[in-house]
Every structure is written in structure tokens, then in C-alpha cells.
Swiss-Prot record:
It comes from the Bacteria. Pfam families: MbnB_TglH_ChrH. This is UPF0276 protein PSEEN3355. It comes from Pseudomonas entomophila (strain L48). Gene3D superfamilies: Divalent-metal-dependent TIM barrel enzymes. HAMAP family: UPF0276. Belongs to the UPF0276 family.
Length: 277
């Protein structure tokens, strides 16, 4: 791994592998992958991951810890994840602040009820995960459409979890925008309420406008102008944090994705102040 500060990154997807392998150094600062998709993978795909990891630092964004679930954390899987993170010298590992299992995998990221009981439950699981992984983790604010039971606001819930678990936040700017539209809150006020010291990374992605008051987080389209504007505001508040462009399907030519990562870099430079390595 090259010891380079992480500023502007791109999600590592198998559908992008041929072009990523041909990508010139300096186009992005790092790549982000889901460890679940690569743990134990050998053969041609494993070799391609190793090739990319030799050229670019790797960050990881998990999919299946189910931090809000009720079943015990999968300690065997956490052990495999720790070895993967250690092998690739991963300094930024994040997971969704959600649950995705209930007596079986649900194949979706579902919101946790915004209650004090849930704060205590998920915080204990985050602390356990951090102990087993031997590192701090960042939780990501998710998009949600059917609001869970809310004894507190989403912002207050996230703040309480960050404090009680003593973990970090991966701020998904698109999710803030989508949730603000769908649940009628002010996105800038949400950003203002997040503790600066907890934010260690960001995501930007595209969404679908189902209706003026209904946005759907898809990761299948270019980032929209309103999200770019909100990202600029996030850079002003949190600095030039490591930021990943997420694109999960409908892949355009790599040059179009790199134009978006170049825009991330430009907004970081113009709005983020001193960069944080």
C-alpha cells in the first residue's frame, strides 16, 4: 500500500475492474470496497484486488454487521474482517447504522428505532465490534423511507450513539439530502448539529426523484446539483475529509466517474480549508 493521505476516492466495484486496472495513478487517492465482497476471494478476481491494493490505498465500507440487530454479532466474520483490514492496511473502516438481519439476512439496510433503548443496544454492539476489530469504526447515516418509531430525532439519535459508543461518523451527504426531503427537515441544520470531531469521511452518490417530495437513494446515477451544493457546505463545516463517489450500477465510462471525483477534489480545495490526512 502507498502511504498517501486519503482525500478523493471511488467505490471499487467488480463491474469497474477492467477500467480501474488501467486507471492512471493520481486520478483518485484511494479506492473503497466492501470487505464482504472480497474476503476469501482468490483466482483472477483476487489477483486484480491485490494489483489495485498495491497501487491505491484501500478503505472499507461494510454491509452486513447488522449493528442494530438482535442476534449476537458474528465474531467469526469479524475475525475474518480484521485479518482483511490488517492485510490491506485499512485505516478507514465504516459500517451502516442500521440492521440487516432478523433470524436470517434481510438483504436490505433497515433503520433502527430512534429510542434511548436502541442507543444503548447499538452502542454496546459498536463497542464490541471495535474491540474485536482492534480499531475504531465509523458508522454511516443511512437513507430510510418508512420512519421507525421516534422518541427522538434522527440527529439526536446519531449524536447519542456517537457519544455512547465513542465511534466516528462516515457522513453520507446524499443520504442527508434524501432524508431531509422525504422527512421534512432542514439539511443544513442537520449538518450543523453533527459534532465536527466525529466526522472522518464522507460519501456522495446519485439518487432518483420519484416525486418533488420523494427521493430514492439509488447509487445508479450522477450526483445531483443539490447534493453537490450540500457537499460544499459539508466541506466548509468538516474540512476536506476522505470522500468516496459511490456508483453501484448503470456504470458510465470511467472518464465520467473521474469527472465527478475531480469535482469532489475541486470542492474540497475550495471549501474544505486545510486538508486532513
Amino acid at each position: 500500500m502507498i502511504d498517501t493521505p486519503l482525500h478523493t476516492g471511488l467505490g471499487l466495484r467488480r463491474g469497474l475492474l477492467p477500467e480501474l486496472l488501467e486507471m492512471q495513478a493520481g486520478e483518485v487517492d484511494f479506492l473503497e470496497c466492501a470487505p464482504e465482497n472480497w474476503i476469501g476471494v482468490g483466482g483472477a478476481f483476487g489477483q486484480k484486488l491485490e494489483c489495485l491494493a498495491e497501487r491505491f490505498p484501500i478503505a472499507c465500507h461494510g454491509l452486513s454487521l447488522s449493528l442494530g440487530g438482535t442476534a449476537p454479532l458474528d465474531e467469526a466474520f469479524l475475525g475474518l474482517t480484521r485479518r482483511f483490514l490488517d492485510r490491506h492496511q485499512v485505516n478507514l473502516y465504516s459500517e451502516h447504522l442500521s440492521y440487516c438481519s432478523d433470524d436470517g439476512h434481510l438483504y436490505d439496510l433497515l433503520p433502527i428505532p430512534f429510542t434511548e433503548e436502541a442507543v444503548h443496544h447499538v452502542s454496546a454492539r459498536i463497542r464490541q465490534a471495535q474491540d474485536l476489530l482492534g480499531r475504531r469504526i465509523a458508522v454511516e447515516n443511512i437513507s430510510y423511507y418508512a420512519a421507525p418509531y421516534q422518541a427522538m430525532s434522527e440527529l439526536d439519535f446519531i449524536r447519542a450513539v456517537l457519544d455512547e459508543a465513542d465511534c466516528d461518523l462516515l457522513l453520507d451527504v446524499n443520504n442527508v439530502f434524501v432524508n431531509a426531503c422525504n422527512h421534512r427537515y432542514e439539511a443544513h441544520a442537520f449538518l450543523a448539529g453533527i459534532p465536527r470531531e466525529r466526522v472522518v469521511g464522507m460519501h456522495v452518490a446519485g439518487h432518483y426523484d420519484e416525486a418533488p417530495d420523494l427521493k430514492v437513494d439509488t447509487h445508479g446515477a450522477p450526483v445531483k446539483e443539490d447534493v453537490w451544493a450540500l457537499f460544499a457546505r459539508a466541506c466548509e463545516r468538516f474540512g476536506a475529509q476522505p470522500t468516496v463517489l459511490e456508483r453501484d450500477f448503470n456504470y458510465p465510462p470511467l472518464a465520467e466517474l473521474l469527472a465527478e471525483t475531480a469535482r469532489i477534489r475541486d470542492l474540497q480545495q475550495r471549501h474544505g480549508g486545510p486538508r486532513h490526512g
